[in-house]
């Protein structure tokens, strides 16, 4: 589980850079959860994360995955559907 979390953390950290030109608001809104995930990862790596902290870390991870998919749909899916509908 932690390997998957760390891999996602690295990808999520770069995501605002990829979407900056398409939607600055979405890119900026992605930064606070990324910072929180790095904080949780630091506590996990130093073995000072409580069971509640583990639970919050997994919840934050799941929420961030869901928000990232919604953002991807808003940025890339909706314009595609609008172009398809108008033609």
UniProtKB/Swiss-Prot annotation:
InterPro entries: Spore_morphogenesis_YwcE. Induction: Repressed by AbrB during growth and activated at the onset of sporulation in a Spo0A-dependent manner. It holds the Pfam family YwcE. The chain crosses the membrane at residues 1-21, 26-46, 56-76. GO terms for cellular component: outer endospore membrane; plasma membrane. It is found in: Cell membrane; Spore membrane; Spore outer membrane. It is a multi-pass membrane protein. The keyword DNA repair does not apply. Keywords: Cell membrane, Germination, Membrane, Transmembrane, Transmembrane helix. GO terms for biological process: spore germination. Its main location: membrane. Disulfide bonds: none annotated. It comes from the Bacteria. Required for proper spore morphogenesis. Important for spore germination. Belongs to the YwcE family. This is Spore morphogenesis and germination protein YwcE. The lineage of its organism: Bacteria, Bacillati, Bacillota, Bacilli, Bacillales. The gene is ywcE.
């Amino acid at each position: 589980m932690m390997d998957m979390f760390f891999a996602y953390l690295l990808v999520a950290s770069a995501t605002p850079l990829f979407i900056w030109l398409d939607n600055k608001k979405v890119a900026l809104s992605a930064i606070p959860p990324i910072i929180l995930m790095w904080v949780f990862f630091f506590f996990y790596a130093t073995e000072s994360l409580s069971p509640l902290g583990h639970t919050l870390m997994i919840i934050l991870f799941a929420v961030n995955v869901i928000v990232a998919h919604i953002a991807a749909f808003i940025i890339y899916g909706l314009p595609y559907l609008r172009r398809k509908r108008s033609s």
